[in-house]
Amino acid sequence: MMKVLVVVALLLTLIIYSSSDGIDDLEADELVSLMAHEQTRAKACTPRYYDCSHDRHRCCRSSMFKDVCTCFYPEGGHYKEVCTCQQPKHLEYMEKAADKIKNLFG
């Protein structure tokens, strides 16, 4: 009896899954519009060493990793916090090593 219930549930799930409207393939123009939207979104990032205090999650990506908004207090009596997009050192070293390996092996 349990096997019959499992098979019926499986068939019911497959029928519902195959008849759903949300699984339709994207048409070419929809895909192009999605890509255009993604490129527009990608251009709105904050470059490295620029001020990111207005939006700390909008730093640009390097070739492998995303930069991080790093905040600090500068020396010299300024007590205002300064935030810039920077790449952490360990990620910078990993990116340089990957580039050297890529250049070594073509």
Curated annotation (Swiss-Prot):
According to the UniProt record, one GO cellular component term is: extracellular region
- Spell out the disulfide connections: C45-C60, C52-C69, C59-C85, C71-C83
User: Where in or outside the cell?
Assistant: Secreted
One Pfam family name is Toxin_35
**Residue ranges the record assigns to the propeptide:** 21-41
Tissue specificity comment: Expressed by the venom gland.
Q: Which InterPro entries does the record match to this protein?
A: Spider_toxin_CSTX_knottin, Spider_toxin_CSTX_Knottin_CS
The principal localisation class reads: secreted
The family classification in the record reads: Belongs to the neurotoxin 19 (CSTX) family. 02 (D7) subfamily.
Q: Which GO terms describe its molecular function?
A: toxin activity
Stated name of the protein = Toxin-like structure LSTX-D9
UniProt comment concerning the protein's domains = The presence of a 'disulfide through disulfide knot' structurally defines this protein as a knottin.
- Give the signal sequence positions: 1-20
Q: Which UniProt keywords apply?
A: Disulfide bond, Knottin, Secreted, Signal, Toxin
